[in-house]
């Protein structure tokens, strides 16, 4: 199945270093970030998991659960956590899926169906497409996905910014402009008429074009 924005994120059962999970049950009513990496004990991925460990309180504050994935076994995850702690100064406290049979990677379009059924003997290059971020909304639908080359570390501040934008859209019927940061002006979505906007924003708005109306960030 091809996954797109607004598709229901496929459910699955998996092993992690923190125990077995059923994905949708684990998510509950929270937002979710599912991010994958090609292989444990690799340089870029080590820095990424460490960076996310440091930023986890920011995600927690937004009701976002984070979960990693690679096709390595649980034992490798556990050993690798020591390296991440040593390099980055903080141990990841979020689950990391051990997708040894490649099932979740295939389910989420990270590997082709003919990639085999075991991670044994696979190198980081074999798994280079296992390098995706999915942001999943509380309705279990995909809100965003990004795929990176294995040589480019992910910017989790940007992922957090995108979540801030999506959460505001759901709550306040607004969109965010290019290069927007929390606290900056936002855009009233076109489907909200001027009459409706007056009820939501009684103090008015800045009209740049009839279709481009800006208001202060309503998030408190």
Can you annotate each of these PLM segments?
Residues 1-220:
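Chalcogenol-based redox active-site neighborhoods
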């Amino acid at each position: 199945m091809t996954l797109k924005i607004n598709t229901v994120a496929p459910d699955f059962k998996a092993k992690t270093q923190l125990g077995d999970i059923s994905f949708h049950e684990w998510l509950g009513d929270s937002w979710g970030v599912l991010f994958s990496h090609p292989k444990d004990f690799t340089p870029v991925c080590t820095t990424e998991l460490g960076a996310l460990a440091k930023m986890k309180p920011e995600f927690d504050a937004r009701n976002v659960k984070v979960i990693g994935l690679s096709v390595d076994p649980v034992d490798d995850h556990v050993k690798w956590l020591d390296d991440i702690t040593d390099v980055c100064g903080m141990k990841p406290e979020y689950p990391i899926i051990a997708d040894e049979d490649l099932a979740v990677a295939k389910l989420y379009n990270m590997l082709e169906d003919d990639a085999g059924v075991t991670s044994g003997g696979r190198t980081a290059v074999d798994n280079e497409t296992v390098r995706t971020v999915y942001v999943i909304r509380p309705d279990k639908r995909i809100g965003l996905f990004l795929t990176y080359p294995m040589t480019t570390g992910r910017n989790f501040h940007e992922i957090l910014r995108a979540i801030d934008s999506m959460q505001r859209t759901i709550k306040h019927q607004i969109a965010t402009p290019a290069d927007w940061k929390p606290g900056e002006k936002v855009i009233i979505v076109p489907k909200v008429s001027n009459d409706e906007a007056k009820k939501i924003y009684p103090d008015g708005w800045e009209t740049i074009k009839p279709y481009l109306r800006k208001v202060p960030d309503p998030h408190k």
